[in-house]
């Protein structure tokens, strides 16, 4: 069973704590992406990154000294977004690190697929960015089915905790043999259920922590998740979609 999760824009360098286990599986493809990015001007990169001048300058400076092989941070500690804050890997026990290393895969526009203990360096690139490398018209074409092939295992079970921008990389290549379960976090707004981005990100990270703490191997056990005020809604769920509703006091 594999769990897929989106990356975060905000990243840090932490070379003082855990040492990465290995390099990302598609590091050669990442080097190709990096060369393409380095060939662009500041203004072109600002448009690709869709950011203000300050963030563009910060990332442009990063590019000049970017090293894919040295001073790396384990991926699960490098990302600082909401989902990763609620996953709280910095306080994982050894068994929980082992669980996420075996089961969690972080999808990335720059690296393709990351195991939690793969060594990474901070970057800025989203899957929807207007990037044309070689014959590929965009990053979805560039990565093709590589993300799916890296994620699928002998169980053929994938738990989707990723955003649509990233889950698309997997969904296009699913086969009838695969069991693909999307986890949906929602809450009542008026007379309908809606997904609120910040709460959903919090819940995705908390779900990974819940699965790691409970060593979950059977998708049915995911339904026991009851953190952050969420409860499983069996009446709204199916074999391919688990719906959790946040009860607002």
Curated annotation (Swiss-Prot):
Q: Which InterPro entries match?
A: YaaA
A Gene Ontology cellular component where this protein is annotated is:
cytosol
Q: Biological process GO terms, please?
A: response to hydroperoxide
Annotated Pfam families: H2O2_YaaD
| Family, similarity comment | Belongs to the UPF0246 family.
UniProt cross-references to PANTHER family, sorted A to Z: PEROXIDE STRESS RESISTANCE PROTEIN YAAA, PEROXIDE STRESS RESPONSE PROTEIN YAAA
This one is known as UPF0246 protein EUBREC_1226
């Amino acid at each position: 069973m594999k769990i897929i999760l989106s990356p975060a824009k905000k990243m840090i360098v932490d070379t003082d704590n855990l040492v990465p286990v290995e390099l990302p599986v598609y590091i050669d493809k990442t080097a190709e992406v990096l060369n393409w990015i380095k060939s662009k001007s500041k203004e072109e990169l600002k448009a690709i990154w869709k950011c203000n001048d300050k963030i563009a300058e910060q990332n442009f400076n990063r590019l000049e000294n970017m090293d894919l092989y040295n001073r790396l941070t384990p991926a699960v500690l490098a990302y600082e977004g909401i989902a990763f804050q609620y996953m709280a890997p910095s306080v994982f026990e050894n068994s929980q690190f082992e669980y996420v290393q075996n089961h969690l895969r972080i999808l990335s526009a720059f690296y393709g697929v990351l195991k939690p203990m793969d060594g990474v360096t901070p970057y800025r690139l989203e899957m929807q960015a207007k990037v044309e490398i070689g014959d590929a018209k965009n990053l979805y074409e560039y990565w093709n089915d590589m993300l799916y092939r890296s994620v699928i295992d002998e169980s053929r079970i994938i738990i989707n905790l990723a955003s649509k921008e990233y889950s698309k990389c997997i969904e296009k290549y699913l086969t009838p043999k695969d069991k693909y379960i999307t986890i949906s976090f929602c809450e009542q707004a008026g007379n309908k259920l809606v997904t609120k981005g910040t709460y959903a990100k919090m819940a995705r990270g908390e779900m990974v922590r819940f699965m790691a703490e409970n060593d979950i191997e059977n998708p049915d056990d995911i339904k026991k998740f009851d953190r952050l005020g969420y409860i499983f809604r069996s009446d709204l769920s199916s074999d391919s979609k688990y719906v959790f509703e946040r009860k607002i006091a």
